[in-house]
């Protein structure tokens, strides 16, 4: 399988034996085999699955940019099932989502925690969704550093700066006031899909796909 087709399968799919389903597409030129993720990418579907880290973030960013180049006026659908992860990796995805022209619709399947929840909320307004049994969790950023006392102080201040910035952005995307966000992210704050909708992290809970008439 090609490097580009590895999308977000990483450790979860490797644990299942590394097997990725293949689909056969018929065309006038004959048959062509795709791994399932590459085939869904043709439908403008991207998967963000597993811990958010640099390699996975680069793949997501590359796919967002590719789909924008293909059609800058058609929505992109980002499916999220993530426990969170690196803030810097997550922010590279966030900034790209805001930068590109197409709306990015976000859909939580399973869980969207920490940076996963942040990216879920960062989707286009009116196009952020959860499936009914998904869970969402927000909290303050985690960090740890060893070294000289002065360096520890520098890193501690940087974590506080990151926390403040994430709170500001979360307040913007949810419509909550900043003080509410500060209070609610002080500890791990788990929400059901319906509670996430009430809070403003998403716009609706999907029970069934709405088919075009």
Swiss-Prot record:
<comment type="function">
    <text>Cleaves peptides in various proteins in a process that requires ATP hydrolysis. Has a chymotrypsin-like activity. Plays a major role in the degradation of misfolded proteins.</text>
</comment>
<feature type="active site">
    <location>
        <position position="139"/>
    </location>
</feature>
<dbReference type="GO" id="GO:0005737">
    <property type="term" value="C:cytoplasm"/>
</dbReference>
<dbReference type="InterPro" id="IPR023562">
    <property type="entry name" value="ClpP/TepA"/>
</dbReference>
<dbReference type="GO" id="GO:0004176">
    <property type="term" value="F:ATP-dependent peptidase activity"/>
</dbReference>
<comment type="subunit">
    <text>Fourteen ClpP subunits assemble into 2 heptameric rings which stack back to back to give a disk-like structure with a central cavity, resembling the structure of eukaryotic proteasomes.</text>
</comment>
<dbReference type="InterPro" id="IPR001907">
    <property type="entry name" value="ClpP"/>
</dbReference>
<dbReference type="GO" id="GO:0051117">
    <property type="term" value="F:ATPase binding"/>
</dbReference>
<dbReference type="InterPro" id="IPR029045">
    <property type="entry name" value="ClpP/crotonase-like_dom_sf"/>
</dbReference>
<feature type="active site" description="Nucleophile">
    <location>
        <position position="114"/>
    </location>
</feature>
<dbReference type="GO" id="GO:0009368">
    <property type="term" value="C:endopeptidase Clp complex"/>
</dbReference>
<dbReference type="InterPro" id="IPR018215">
    <property type="entry name" value="ClpP_Ser_AS"/>
</dbReference>
<keyword id="KW-0963">Cytoplasm</keyword>
<dbReference type="GO" id="GO:0006515">
    <property type="term" value="P:protein quality control for misfolded or incompletely synthesized proteins"/>
</dbReference>
<keyword id="KW-0378">Hydrolase</keyword>
<dbReference type="InterPro" id="IPR033135">
    <property type="entry name" value="ClpP_His_AS"/>
</dbReference>
<keyword id="KW-0720">Serine protease</keyword>
<protein>
    <recommendedName>
        <fullName>ATP-dependent Clp protease proteolytic subunit</fullName>
        <ecNumber>3.4.21.92</ecNumber>
    </recommendedName>
</protein>
<dbReference type="Pfam" id="PF00574">
    <property type="entry name" value="CLP_protease"/>
</dbReference>
<comment type="similarity">
    <text>Belongs to the peptidase S14 family.</text>
</comment>
<keyword id="KW-0645">Protease</keyword>
<dbReference type="GO" id="GO:0004252">
    <property type="term" value="F:serine-type endopeptidase activity"/>
</dbReference>
